[in-house]
């Protein structure tokens, strides 16, 4: 991050009162974090020698989705069954990457890939996962037409799943509906037919979004800046019910570099 100020203290000097991540957890205002640093790449190379392209490959993406679909049952409270499961966000580095994950997940559910949703998961939650993608589409972006074509398909899938009627002309309304569905603060979202399990994002929803039933953040990208890491982590650790004990973070790239980045971020924002 170079010499840029990373904390409020560095930017503005002494604060009248500090209330840190550590204090909030200690006071029981929020839950603690459990971070699981995973890696899909088996290689004799040192971590820093592994090329970025290794994490672009379809096999890596399938491993990530297998982990989400079949190896996160406890984090997502899936054994509790219909209506009781938690939700997750998958964050990736770019819109094309988010689109690729969306398409691959559809392909898995269509039975076209080696990864399947396990029978054990289906026993608890037959329609898992219900998912979508959300990002802001700007008409000024160069690739905007391609983004909009994909988002049109996403909205059609979403409308079919939830009986809504969104179109590209109402992207704001769609994004608001995704927010509300993920937040589950209205009674109608207590019913399984109105619930989402997973939302794929780049940066949207990673700051300021409050959804107590969101338990897990899956990260398939390089470590973010310290303040962005803490903000993103903090989507997961809102107090919800007596089964949710932690906010779960699962990373899939460069585990050593990620651990260093997280340790640094927690040190910066917890007074050590």
Provide a role label for each language-model segment:
Residues 72, 271-272:
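An amphipathic alpha-helix/rod signature
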Residues 1-52, 61, 206-271:
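Signature of the SF2 helicase/ATPase Hel1-core->accessory helical subdomain module
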Residues 52-201:
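Conserved C-terminal RecA-like helicase domain
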């Amino acid at each position: 991050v170079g010499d840029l100020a990373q904390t409020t203290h560095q930017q503005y000097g002494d604060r009248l009162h500090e209330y840190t991540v550590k204090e909030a957890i200690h006071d029981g205002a929020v839950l603690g974090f459990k971070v699981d640093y995973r890696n899909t790449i088996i290689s004799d190379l040192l971590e820093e020698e592994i090329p970025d392209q290794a994490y672009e490959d379809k096999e890596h993406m399938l491993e990530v989705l297998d982990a989400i679909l079949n190896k996160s049952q406890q984090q997502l409270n899936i054994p509790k069954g219909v209506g009781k499961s938690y939700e997750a966000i998958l964050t990736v580095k770019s819109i094309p990457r988010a689109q690729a994950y969306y398409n691959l997940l559809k392909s898995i559910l269509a039975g076209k890939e080696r990864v399947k949703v396990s029978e054990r998961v289906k026993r608890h939650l037959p329609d898992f996962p219900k998912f979508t993608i959300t990002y802001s589409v700007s008409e000024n972006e160069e690739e905007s037409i391609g983004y909009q074509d994909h988002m049109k398909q996403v909205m059609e899938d979403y409308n079919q799943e939830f009986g809504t009627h969104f179109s590209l002309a109402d992207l704001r309304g769609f994004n608001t509906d995704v927010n509300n569905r993920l937040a589950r603060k209205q009674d109608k979202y207590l019913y399984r037919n109105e619930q989402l399990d997973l939302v794929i994002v780049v940066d949207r929803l990673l700051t300021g979004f409050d959804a107590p039933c969101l338990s897990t953040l899956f990260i398939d990208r390089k470590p973010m800046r310290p303040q962005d890491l803490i903000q993103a982590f903090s989507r997961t650790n809102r107090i919800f019910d007596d089964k949710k004990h932690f906010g779960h973070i699962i990373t899939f790239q460069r585990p050593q570099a990620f651990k260093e980045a997280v340790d640094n971020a927690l040190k910066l924002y917890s007074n050590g």
